Each structure stands twice: as structure tokens, then as C-alpha cells.
Amino acid sequence: MRNRFVSFLGVASYFAAGNFHSISHGRLHAAKQIAHTRAVNTNSTNFARVAFFPNGTLSGLGLSSTCEDALYATVDCDDEISSVMTDGYIGSLDNETLTDLICASTCEASIAELYDSVSTSCGDSAELIAGISYLSLIGQVWSSWNQSCFVDLTTGQNCNDVIAKFDNVTSQADIATTDLCSYCYVKKLEMMQADAYSSAYNDDFESEYKYVANTCNLTVTDFNATTSVFNASLPATTSTCLSGNTYITTDGDTCDSIALAQGVSAATLFYTNPNILNCSDIITGTSLCLPLTCTDLYSVQSNDTCASVAVSNFISFSDVINWNSQLTWNCSNLVSPDPHWGSVLCASAPGGNYTGQALTTTSSSDATDIVDPPTGVTVAIGSTLDCGAWFVNEASLGYNCSSICLSNSIAMHLFVDANPSLNYTTCDSDLVTGDAYCVDPLTNWEYYSSNTTSISTVTAAISPTWPVQTGIDSNCDAYYEVQSSSTTASSTPAATTAISSSTPLTSNSTSTTVTPPAATQSGIPANCIEYYVAQSGDTCATVETKHSITAAQFLSWNPAVSSDCTTGFWADEAYCVSVS
């Protein structure tokens, strides 16, 4: 799990470049105390308790034993509590079941108890890094819970869900007064202004709050952003445009109009340019870094989902997410107005399809040979070994994913595909210090493993191992057995035995292959012989139990799935459950 909660708590939010668009748009407001107002929520559920800091992860950091023990305490919350952690705007989760799990009253009470315990045992001087105290991190969890779970006092509905149903308008003046002055909307702005743990309350929201106060005759004494409890200095960064192409905006430009004219994703354009404050009205003369171009664009419709976009364009769900950086891992903001990034997506790989180097198994030492990983370093989990060059992530270099790609002339999407322990949207924080990453995968690296042994050339005719009809040509070099419809694909009903005399590889082989019954993610081994299409309600654990495999096997065969199964696992996608 690699200390999941440690990575998601505040530090990652502020120092992992690009994880949330609002981080780069906003600023870390400086410190003003806020009283925690408990949201009205009567849901009560029993959960396996969650540790924000797994036992032992804080040893050796100079904390008192009392403080360290307090931080290891667990809370009575669902593990999905991590999904509400953000330095940006907190909106609807678009999932009633998930909202109920996160917003159980037992969770809030447990967080409050932990906050009091850490306050007593650690105070506000014990810091994870200079300027970020442990107490402030627990406070951030509490604040995020409050803003995720507050409800309408009359109806009991989650206020974020209520706000999400407001009419989609382009001007404040077009918002219905009943919505504008509703308890939920006014309370939302009040909580954002008072939040000392987030930079979401920016100049735009301040103007919005003033407009609401004036329209609704509210008495508000302070519209200024609350000073942050975080006093850490952001590290100096250099701005680099990955594509090398910039664009100066003209009057009337929008994210969509630029995306269509330049052949890029509006989502990625918004994500990578923090100087875009409003995608519908970009300030004239703004200098923008253009994303890598893509040959196929798609305009999102109001009833679209990432699954429907994928089906319409013959690509996978994960492709939609990976090629359009502003989209969240579960695609919850595809048509969201918070913030509205536009509607134009890349439906093909940004930068084009990579052809790679020629794969060779000769003994020559030219640049097309497979290069062994550097001696004495650990290869990142799942990284291809069919690789012509490696990058070791040394702490002294201070590289992020963009700088690694630039210095090694590799497209970001290819870098992530060749190293599946990295996620396109969280790449910087996924990098492990000291690990080696492939930065030059060879041609056909997805299909051939450098650990396999070459076998002798097969020259004899292919003989099928099952009954066939009469009259089939004796020169047939491939057979396919008709299969019945099933959500599980295995080598028995979908066996193809084939050999090609024209393939330019150094060895020919007789093989049994399986066609996945649905979209798959990168990293699945070529020798997978059985797939399972995840159904609604499935988890990694249920799939493992159903197919009598271990968690280690499932994660090894499906490296795009995170170790805790919270990312990379979606319904209607195929996962490998057996290999030859």
C-alpha cells in the first residue's frame, strides 16, 4: 500500500505538481483558526477502522511516544474517506452509496476524537515537514469531511448533491434566486471562506460570495480568504511546455475553440495552464502552453459518460482518462461545471502512436538492443524489461515526470504505459526514489517479454487439437474455435493457433492467445489465458475469491490496478485472472 494515507494527506496535495487544477490556480492561504462545525448527518455504519498513518511509518522522526501513538490511532470510517481529500473545490461525489459511506456520522465523530487526541498529545508544533503540522493534516481531513457531508436542514439531502442539480448557467445573474439564496449554497460559500485548509476560495469565489450576500440581503463581516494553517514554502519550479508549442489568446477564445483549432484536448489545455481562470472567457493576450496534438477529437454531449465516449471511439475507458488530464480517475467531472473545462477531448493518443525501436535479439551492441536495468537498483513494479534505456529516479535530480520525459525524448503516455506503476494523472507522486524506469521501450514491447526463451522455428503444418469440418485448405496456418457468449474469456473457447512466415521476428512459435472480452488496461501480460469482466459491485477481493487466486497474483497480472484497489478497477473492463 506504500503508506497510502501519508501520500494523500496535505503534503501530496501541495507538492505533487498538477494533481488538481485548483492547486496550480490557487494559492496556499496563510493561518486563521476556524471552529469545526459538525455537519448534520445521522448515517451510522460499522467499518473496518482506517489508520491515517499506518503503524510504524512515523518511527525515527523524533516524535514523542505519546504523540506517535496518537497518530497511529484508527478512525471508524470507510476507506473511501481518501476520495474527499483535495486542496481544491469539493463538490458532489455523484454516487449516493459512496456519499452515505463517507458521510456516516460515526466517521465524523471518530475524526473529531482523533483531532482532540493529536491536539493533546502532539500540539501544533510537531511537524511532518517544516510548516505542516500533523494536527493540521488531521484538521484538513475534518474540514474536507464537513464540506463533503453537510446537508440541507429541511430536506436532509446532501448539499453538494443539491447544488449539483442547479441549472447550468454562464452568468451569476442567470442563477435562480431560490438556488442562489438557498441554505446549501450560502452555507457552501460560508464554509469555503472559513476554510483554512484549502486554496479553493479564490478571487472568483470571493466575488461570488459578495454577489450572493448583496442579492440575498446577508450580513457578512469578512469576504477575504481565511489564512492557511499551512506555512510551508513551495519549492521553486521551472515552467516547461512539454509540446514546445505556445499560443497567445485572442478576443473570444475559449478552451473548446482553441482545442478544435489546434487539435488538442480542452481538458488537458485547462489542466496544464493555471492562468486560465474561466474556460468560457479567457483573457485576451494570455500565453498558453498547448498540449500534444491528437488526430481524433470528440465533443462531449450532455448525456455522455467516459464509457460511452470510449465505445463511440473504439478506445478503452482508461484511454479517455489518460489522454485528457483534467478528468478525474472515475470520470465524475466529464460534464461537471466545477470547474467547467470545456467539452473537446482527445480520442486518440496525444503525440500520435509510438512505433518504438526495432526489437532484436542479436548480440550486436547497437542502440536497438535490449539494455539491462542498471546494476544495484530496483526496477519499478511492472515496468517492461524490453527496454533500450533506463532512468534511475535519484532524489538529488529533483525530476518530475515531465522533466524525465523531456530529457529522454519520450511521450508521457508511452512513459506511463511502459511503467504501469505510474498513473497519468498522479505520475509525479507515484515516482519512487531510487527505482529504475524504462524510458525507451522497444517495438512490440507490449507483446514480448525479455524474460521469455526463444524456441526453434516451426516449419511443420499446424494441426488443430479440436474437431474441424472437412474441406479446409491444407495450407491453413490459423484456426479459431467458435465460443459462446460469456463475461469470462479463457484459452479453451477462444484458442487461436497461428504461425506467420512473414513476421520479421527472430523466432516463430505456436501460441495460444485469448481475445479480451472487453476493454483492458495497460500492463496485462501477453500470456494471459483467462479474463473476467468486472460487474457492478465487484471488488478486487471478490474477483480473487471467485477465481481462486491471490491478491498478489491479481495485482501482478493487472498492474494498472492500485494495491488497495481504489484506482484502476472499474466495472465493464476485463481483468486477467489466469496466465499460462
Curated annotation (Swiss-Prot):
**What are the residue boundaries of the LysM domain, all occurrences included?**
245-290, 296-342, 391-439, 530-577
Phenotype when the gene is knocked out: Leads to enhanced fungal virulence, with faster decaying on infected fruits.
Q: Identify the stretch(es) annotated as Disordered.
A: 498-518
Matches recorded under InterPro entries = LysM1-like, LysM_dom, LysM_dom_sf
Q: Tell me where it mainly resides.
A: secreted
Where does the record place it? Answer: Secreted
Signal peptide, first to last residue: 1-30
Keyword terms of this UniProt record: Chitin-binding, Glycoprotein, Repeat, Secreted, Signal, Virulence
Any single Pfam family the record assigns to this protein: LysM
Question: Which SMART domains does this chain map to?
Answer: LysM (SM00257)
Q: What are the annotated glycosylation sites?
A: 43, 55, 95, 146, 168, 217, 224, 231, 278, 303, 330, 353, 400, 423, 451, 508
What are the recorded GO MF terms, alphabetically? chitin binding
Gene Ontology CC, one term: extracellular region
Question: Record's CDD domains?
Answer: LysM (cd00118)
Q: Does the keyword Glycoprotein apply?
A: yes
Additional facts recorded: In plants, chitin acts as a microbe-associated molecular pattern (MAMP) that is recognized by lysin motif (LysM)-containing plant cell surface-localized pattern recognition receptors (PRRs) that activate a plethora of downstream immune responses.
Q: What does this protein do?
A: Secreted LysM effector that might have a role in sequestration of chitin oligosaccharides (breakdown products of fungal cell walls that are released during invasion and act as triggers of host immunity) to dampen host defense.
Q: Please give the record's comment on domains.
A: The LysM (lysin motif) domains are small globular domains involved in binding chitin in eukaryotes. LysM7 contains 4 LysM domains.
The family assignment reads: Belongs to the secreted LysM effector family.
What protein am I looking at? Secreted LysM effector LysM7
Phylogenetic placement of the source organism: Eukaryota, Fungi, Dikarya, Ascomycota, Pezizomycotina
